[in-house]
Every structure is written in C-alpha cells, then in structure tokens.
Amino acid sequence: MTTKNKRLYQAIIVFCLLVFSGIVYYYFFCSFSAKDTRQYLYIDDDDNVDSVIYKIKPMATSHGMSGFLTLVRHSSYPETVRSGRYAIESGDGAFAVFRRIKNGMQEPLSLTIPCVRTMDKLAGYVGSKLMIDSAQIYHALSDETVCSKYGYDTLTIACMFIPNTYDMYWNISLDKFLDRMKKECSGFWTEDRLQKAADMGFDEVKTITLASIVDEETTNSAEKPMVAGMYYNRLKSGMPLQADPTIKFALKDFSLKRIYHNMLSVNSPFNTYRNTGLPPGPIRIPTIDGIDAVLNHVAHDYLYMCAKEDFSGTHNFAKTYDEHLKNAEKYSRALNARGIK
C-alpha cells in the first residue's frame, strides 16, 4: 500500500470514528429533556418497562428517546424496574437518565405536614405528595391496632404529626412513613418541653389538644400564650372550656361563622360546653407556635375571652362573667352590622 493510500485509509477511519462518536454523543449525551426546566418521572410499584417508557416519552426529545430505548434493550432493566421519583435535568443525556433510573438514584422530596382538622384531609394531602394511596393512609389512621402501635388511639393519632418539613423518598412505604412521623414526634418532645408539660399536669396529648383549640381561636401568634393561659385557668378551676371551635368540630361544619345556642347541645365528647375538661383529642394538627404557646402560657387571672369587635383576629379578655357579657354584646352587634349569620 502506497503512502498516499495509507493516508487516505487513515483519513477514512478517522472520519468514521468522528461520525460514530458524533452519533453516540447525539443519541446518548445530548440533552434528553424536551424542556429547559427540571422534570420528574414517577415510577409506581406496579409499573413495568412499557409503562415507564409511556411515562417518559412525553418528556424526551426524539433522539434522546431513541438512545434511551437502545439502552433499555441492551440491559437488564426490563427485569429490574425500580419505583421512585427521578429528576430529569434539562442538560442530562439519555445515558445519565437511564443510569439514574436503572440504579434507583431517586431524589427525595420535601413534605410539609399541614395543620389540617381531620385525618381524612391529612391522608388526602400526604397521598397527593407520596406514592402511598390516600385511602390506605386513612385506613391506617382509623385503625385502633395501628394507632396503638404508636401509643395513640384514633382520636389522638393526630398528636403524632408535628407540622414541620421533612425530606423523604416519594416511594416510602406506609409503615416507614408512620415510623418516621413517630421518630420526628419523639425528637420534637425535648426534655424541656416534656418538663414544662409535666409542670402543668399535662402530657403530650393534653398539650397538643389544648394547642389545637388555641390555634382555632386565634392565628395571632403573639396572643396565643394569653389564650392558652385563659383556657388553662378554666381547666384548673373546673370550669368547662366552652370553646366554640370544639362545637364546629363536633358538628363537622367548619364553615360556621357564628355559634348559636341551639348548637351547644350537640351530643359529642368534643362538646366543651356539655363536658368539662379537655376533649378526648385534638381538633386539628396544631402549629408549633400553638404547642409552645401552651407550654409557655401567660399566667394571668382571665377566665373569659371574646373576639374583638374590630375583627382584628384578637380578643377582649375578662375576669368576670358580667365583663365578658359586655364584650360579647359588642362583638354580637358588630356581627349583626356586617350581616354575618
């Protein structure tokens, strides 16, 4: 072979290698995503390779999808599909995406426990954020056996959910989710908080139950220790709490703007007009501010309170019933003036 032919042959080889490298780069390393923003692929436990392909196809460019399918065909992935929540970055190539999904390299999400009133609402929210079905969550929270495993019953299980933000994997199992919530709850109850509760004659459940009422009475964090102190005074003196939010909870009508006398006779253990002491469990998941307001309540002599007539969300406090009636009349007139029924 002449020198000229050798050079031509080498040039052809180099050209072919460049073309091959370009093809490999184009299909496996150029951007897989069809969007410029991060996308998430959610793979359920019952997904197979076909359903994964169906889910990921709308997210991909045509060349990226071709590269992905090639990798799928020449791997064990069809037999090893892993559930999870997988991030697809705008600059990722098909190889990076495939490797992440095949190896189960999912990205955790941040789940914030909401301050909801009922466990069906909690189940619905958590179910919308995690792979766990909301009906499965609600069934567990309504099961005395499950609740007792964590030291609660179906009326107090809300106490286990501290409204913080937690990082966890989307495909966490129900058991592991509940275990995590119990662990976080135990961590929340520091020695300082437990001691303050004990000094009041309270435990975790009683503290959270009162905090739930305080939170329903006011959203003003600065006023919560005052409200907590007022209810604590009533508990110590043996007076019924007479907390209107417990009537809403007993009636399961949270749209009520006013509580009328005929509503106060509702037959429910949560009716704090008919029953003395705390209700048998919280009427919502309270805020951390609400919990700490109970533990750090203001010591005062007030036994009554009524929403202020200026609708500021704060209250007029009173030491005597006569004084309270005057405050209540001012608030009633303000409600009537606004046509609130």
Give the ranges of each region predicted by the language model.
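N-terminal type II signal-anchor transmembrane helix
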Residues: 1-38
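Bacterial extracytoplasmic/cell-wall-associated proteins, especially those involved in peptidoglycan
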Residues: 124, 130-135, 139, 146-341
